[in-house]
Amino acid sequence: VAHIEIIGKYGLPVVVSINAFPSDTEAEHALIKEAALKAGAFDAVISRGWALGGEGCAELASAIDKASSQPHKANLLYPLEISIKDKIEIIAHQVYGAGTVVYTPEADEAIEKYTDLGYGNFPICMAKTQYSLSHDPAVKGVPRGFDFPVREVRLSAGAGFIVPITGEISTMPGLSSKPVFIGMDIDTKTGRITGLS
């Protein structure tokens, strides 16, 4: 429900995919759909893509198509002209439910540097755990009022983002100009995979 409310703040219609498994009951699916619609979702549909591939996602695709056809205006939570810290704090409070945002000296220094270099109007791309609305993967549910640590702030000038790093998270490395997967292949007749070493 919290995710539906968060996406709604951005002015976007929400479609909830209910991953249906053989042990589920229709009553469980109905309860999930009712809660999703009550929270503001455009629709909530059963998906069996894990079992049926594309065919199992047809209803989901149709719902997404309908939702994307509705009039809506996507928006940021903040104007780009406000300070980097103000943008971080709006996201921390309005999206994650944080109380106080706590910056390390390194994060403060980076924010000042990027602002001085003219990147202060970039949008924010928060790097945090996917396992919690907080910075801490062990904190479940919808926490409120916690301290939200920003330990590092990076500049992604080419992509056009300021990236605050929160909690203990590793960011994805970039790929080389010739990623290893380019040399991988599967022989469709024998099933033999090549190029893994």
What are these regions (language model features)?
Residues V1-L31, A35-S197:
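P-loop NTP-binding site
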